[in-house]
């Protein structure tokens, strides 16, 4: 049964102009992947977000949607909005301000019985957006073949899976903005979209939704994946040496240098996501389809979160990850590597520095005295690597929003360095190309003003080529400090890419 009923809906219309209409049901036979095939696979713009918390246990909610109200794409000084009906408008100036302006007219009605993230913005904030937050930081200008600096979908209907209660919500928003809006028509339209989502889930799987066939470890032996890098190994080692000179000179304490590995893939990009979620599961699994290119993410690291508390206040969270070891082949070896990691002076010094940076970032927008480290230097294990992780929280000041929080923390210190501004200047000097989505963030901003973003690491950028094949790029970095060994830092970038490259190789 669809809720709320029309009588209750008319009462809610006094509270705002964007009202959720929904249907919920128990559905333990449907999965987010099968639902994506039924609802989203034929749409040019769509997304699927899932979570495997700590790399080991399933997160509670999954989100999927398509057919957005509008798409906003930022590239250099221009930001273009494309409406659902195809109408376009181009703006000049700060895309983050334009993004906020596009949302200004929405006054959502919040229903406490619904899960978080029930609608809003879903998309990607690329690294080069830093030019609008810290104008002194130089960035490469975009080229026609580059992904946009940022791209966002405004979603007004979606499906949410509750993996704990085995429920599905089909949600659509009734839009009451504009003059002389008829409540009954708006309500009926939202109900029709909810019903359409429900009926789509009752359809059989489309022909392209075949069982995923991954090569076994035996089949993969001796089978190499051909890829190229945007830098030579010797060049990377030279860049590390230059970065260490800057550290010795007192310019910085740390800087993250990266390389981009690229290969050609000739099948459906969504299969890459399915392979990645099996081979390299993470807390922030994501598939964003933007037509001719996709973001496929398995990030382990939250960038920033802003969660609405029962008292209406926003709680801010950053969760720095720094310190890496490969997983052991046996349990004793795994434990030994974890102990070694927690007793490595270089890794500990780097991690503590980034925790302090996270505290300072939150301190810029949180209530004085509210910023706390509530989890310090614990080991989190993933399929191919383990990390040292800490958690920093604070109460967002009453005059600050989730957008202020994002600007205060962007980009994360774990992918830039410290001090952050000077580190980013050095990144622009030493790295050969713009970073694009890598080290930016992906996630959502919902209608309650909550924000949930992951750092775009362990992430594939998939771009369609003229011959119909796909260029898949994976970018990974290493934190350079005073006593860094250049060769080990180079190897760390390859270790971090291993899970993603294996997901591609398993489909070869």
UniProtKB/Swiss-Prot annotation:
Mg(2+) binds at residues 350, 492. Chorismate binds at residues 323-324, 438, 458, 477-479. It holds the Pfam family Anth_synt_I_N. One of its GO terms (molecular function) is metal ion binding. GO terms for biological process: L-tryptophan biosynthetic process. Its cofactor is Mg(2+). Transmembrane segments: none annotated. Keywords: Amino-acid biosynthesis, Aromatic amino acid biosynthesis, Lyase, Magnesium, Metal-binding, Tryptophan biosynthesis. Feedback inhibited by tryptophan. InterPro entries: ADC_synthase (IPR005801), Anth_synth_I-like (IPR019999), Anth_synth_I_N (IPR006805), Anth_synth_I_PabB (IPR005256), Chorismate_C (IPR015890). It comes from the Bacteria. L-tryptophan binds at residues 51, 283-285. Belongs to the anthranilate synthase component I family. This is Anthranilate synthase component 1. The gene is trpE.
């Amino acid at each position: 049964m669809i809720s709320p009923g029309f009588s209750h809906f008319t009462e809610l219309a006094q509270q705002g102009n964007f009202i959720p209409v929904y249907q919920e049901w128990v559905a333990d036979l449907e999965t987010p992947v099968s639902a994506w095939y039924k609802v989203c696979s034929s749409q040019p713009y769509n997304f699927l977000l899932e979570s495997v918390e700590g790399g080991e246990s399933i997160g509670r909610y999954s989100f999927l949607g398509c057919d957005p109200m509008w798409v906003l794409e930022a590239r250099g000084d221009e930001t273009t909005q494309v409406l659902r009906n195809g109408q376009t408008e181009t703006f000049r100036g700060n895309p983050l301000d334009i993004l906020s302006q596009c949302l200004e007219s929405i006054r959502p009605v919040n229903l406490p019985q619904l899960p978080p993230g029930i609608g809003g913005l879903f998309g990607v904030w690329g690294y080069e957006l830093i030019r609008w937050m810290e104008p002194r930081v130089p960035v490469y200008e975009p080229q026609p073949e580059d992904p946009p600096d940022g791209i966002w979908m405004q979603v007004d209907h979606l499906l949410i899976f509750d993996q704990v209660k085995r429920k599905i919500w089909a949600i659509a928003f009734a839009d009451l903005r504009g003059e002389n809006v008829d409540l009954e028509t708006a309500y009926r339209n939202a109900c029709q979209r909810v019903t359409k989502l429900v009926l789509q889930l009752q359809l059989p799987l489309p022909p392209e939704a075949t069982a995923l066939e991954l090569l076994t470890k035996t089949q993969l032996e001796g089978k190499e994946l051909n890829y190229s890098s945007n830098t030579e190994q010797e060049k990377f080692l030279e860049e590390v040496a230059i970065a260490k000179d800057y550290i010795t000179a007192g310019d910085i304490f740390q800087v993250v240098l990266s390389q981009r590995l690229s290969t050609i893939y000739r099948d459906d990009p969504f299969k890459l996501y399915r392979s990645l979620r099996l081979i390299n599961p993470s807390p922030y699994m994501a598939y964003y389809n933007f037509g001719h290119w996709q973001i496929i993410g398995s990030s382990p690291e939250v960038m920033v979160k802003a969660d609405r508390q029962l008292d209406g206040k926003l709680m801010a969270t950053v969760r720095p990850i720094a310190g890496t070891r490969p997983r052991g082949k046996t349990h004793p070896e795994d434990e030994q590597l974890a102990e070694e990691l927690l007793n490595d002076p270089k890794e500990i010094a780097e991690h503590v520095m980034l925790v302090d940076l996270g505290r300072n970032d939150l301190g810029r927008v949180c209530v004085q005295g509210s910023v706390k480290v509530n989890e310090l230097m614990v080991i989190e294990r993933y399929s191919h690597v383990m990390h040292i992780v800490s958690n920093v929280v604070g109460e967002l000041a009453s005059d600050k929003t989730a957008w202020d929080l994002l600007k205060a923390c962007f980009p994360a210190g774990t992918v830039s360095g410290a001090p952050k501004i000077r580190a980013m200047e050095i990144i622009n000097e030493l790295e050969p190309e713009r970073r694009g989505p890598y080290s930016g963030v992906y996630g959502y901003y919902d209608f309650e003003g909550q924000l949930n973003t992951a750092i775009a690491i362990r992430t594939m950028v998939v771009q369609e080529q003229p011959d119909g094949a796909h260029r898949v790029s994976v970018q990974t970095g290493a934190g350079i400090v005073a006593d860094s060994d250049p060769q080990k830092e180079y190897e760390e970038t390859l270790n971090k890419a291993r899970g993603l490259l294996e997901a591609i190789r398993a489909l070869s």
